[in-house]
């Protein structure tokens, strides 16, 4: 099943409002930053701490709605906020939960499932294994930048591996548009070679430009064309 445009639950709208506020406040802090692998948090970021206290579980899972579900987008935003806040412990726990539960234990072998929560039988796990490319791009970006800023080789390697998989599984050549990022790997080709379903909000230009800048020579042109 592909991701669909479900109605927004009030709790998810609150999460989105907090996310947009944090994005507006926090993005300048990352721009132009240079690596300081030994740096600690420079100071309190009250909005990030409020977000974490309200939505982030101790194990690194972000609660997205009243049903206790988690979306890959929420995990990707939390990774970005933790990076901007220089909050390495939270970044590590968010990544660990995301890798264990949405990537089935290995970032290098698959795209993350976009929806996780309680199943009909009462067990908790993946509810929809399709991926959401906006989350995938932000996760790859956060990992690559965390690797650069904190000098963590594993983060850089994971980010680059995920970026390669995004190109392989979530892009297509569209007539008149060229190489294009699809919203996910499954469910967005309406008619093969003729019609596709797109979502322009899934194209964060600053993240795409950064992924193009750090991509291997053989794929840099593909990223630049998105």
For the regions a protein language model found, what residue spans apply to each?
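N-terminal secretory signal peptides
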Residues: 1-10, 14, 18-24, 28
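Short N-terminal micro-motifs specific to bacterial/archaeal maturation
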Residues: 6-7, 69, 81-82, 130, ...
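Structured catalytic/translocation cores of nucleotide/phosphate-coupled proteins
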Residues: 15, 79-82, 94-99, 105-107, ...
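Low-complexity, Ser/Thr/Pro/Gly-enriched N-terminal "stalk/linker" regions
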Residues: 21-26, 32-73, 83-129, 176-180, ...
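Extended ligand-binding clefts on enzyme/binding-domain cores
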Residues: 37-46, 68-72, 133-134, 156-226
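Well-ordered alpha-helical scaffold segments within catalytic/enzyme domains
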Residues: 74-88, 97, 137-152, 203-218
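Substrate-binding cleft of extracellular glycoside hydrolase catalytic domains
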Residues: 103, 108-165
